[in-house]
Amino acid sequence: MTRVKRGYIARRRRTKIRLFASSFRGAHSRLTRTITQQKMRALVSAYRDRGRQKRDFRRLWITRINAVTRENEVSYSYIRLIHNLYKRQLLLNRKILAQIAILNKNCLHIISKKIIK
């Protein structure tokens, strides 16, 4: 029986996987089986955390807006601010409001006072 020389396709596939896992530690960057397992695990974590990141940032923005709105008036809160914004049909999302709250608190106080009236 003659010797069969395998092509370069499997090697190319493995090197592509190794490039993905080159920053991993230990056997996770050297052994092909563990590389494939860790690659799948990394991609699952990345997919899961993209959704989690959106939730976390929204929570952060809400916390920042609430902290700044409660500084002046104790009774006035985040939920009342958002409700009044919708009533007045002002299109300011939470990200923009949080940036205004951090960079220019007076501007947010002016906006909230105008909305109340």
Swiss-Prot record:
Q: Name one GO molecular function term.
A: structural constituent of ribosome
Q: Which GO biological process categories is it annotated with?
A: ribosomal large subunit assembly; translation
Database matches in InterPro entries: Ribosomal_bL20, RIBOSOMAL_L20_CS, Ribosomal_protein_bL20_C
Which UniProt keywords are listed? Chloroplast, Plastid, Ribonucleoprotein, Ribosomal protein, RNA-binding, rRNA-binding
State the GO CC annotations. chloroplast; ribonucleoprotein complex; ribosome
Its annotated compartments are:
Plastid, Chloroplast
Among Pfam families, the record links this protein to: Ribosomal_L20
Highest taxon, organism lineage: Eukaryota
Keyword RNA-binding included in the entry's annotation: yes
**Location (main, coarse):** plastid
Q: Briefly, what is this protein's role? A: Binds directly to 23S ribosomal RNA and is necessary for the in vitro assembly process of the 50S ribosomal subunit. It is not involved in the protein synthesizing functions of that subunit.
Similarity field:
Belongs to the bacterial ribosomal protein bL20 family.
Q: Which PANTHER family match?
A: 39S RIBOSOMAL PROTEIN L20
Q: What is this protein called?
A: Large ribosomal subunit protein bL20c
Q: Which organism is it from?
A: Lemna minor (Common duckweed)
- Recorded name of the encoding gene: rpl20
